[in-house]
Amino acid sequence: MLPTLFSPAHLDACFAADYAGAHARFRHACDRHEHSGYREFVYRQTGPDKEKLVTATAWLGNKNASRVLVLQSATHGVEGFCGSAIQVDCLDYFIESKLPDDLAILFIHALNPHGFAWLRRVNEDGIDLNRNFVDFNQPLPVNEGYRTLAKDILPESESEFAAASERLKLKQQEMGRVAYEKAMSGGQYEFADGLFYGGQSASQSRLYLEEIFHAYQLHKRKKIAVLDFHTGLGPFGYGEAICDHPPGSAGVKWAKRVYGDSVTEPALGSSSSVPKLGLVDYFWQESLG
């Protein structure tokens, strides 16, 4: 029992007011571990106060562990406040508690530091990183539904906003909630100034994630669990375990065995999310097999 770690004061201290503060807290938490192997992957852009932007990693536990838990934050930039706090809390917890010999934790802090620093969901190129994991050597997916909504999502002038909003409401009624949400937020690769844009090539964050995957030799581990922290969907204050593995797959079965029946599946309609294109989940699925 570690009451000091789970006190409101401790949990509040895990949360930062901005990206720079979150990075500093994460670095400090890593420095308290003698062998965390803290690393930085630096971006060419800077934050609003000219601060350096980095995706940082740390490793707790046996370097040769066959089982690895990956904790990833700020895929959607501004959502990183929650994920970063969880990572800091976890690092603090294992100051006093020891991991099993064959289990390690890989922390990936601020996968999208630009969005985190500038309070944006997207990255430095206006890309939704969680739609960027498609095969850019193949023809890109076409979101026909988004095409029908695009002009009203981004009207040409402010005077058209009210009428556009009404048309979108009518579209939602016509299409139904799920079809509308898939069209709106499922991901698109055609309108660079639109919402949920997945880009035309691999982002810097994606390239760094691929580098991290190989640097830590994750392909050689026997079991990998990945928790990518997001906020904004579902009931306030409730943590939904969303699994985007194909229905009935070994990944879904394993997730439910580990995390229980609270695991939801967008493909089956049991989640607050809908099926989407180019998720970072698909990178992990493809890389781990």
Language-model segments: residues:
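Structured catalytic-domain cores with a bias toward divalent-metal coordination
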Residues: M1-G289
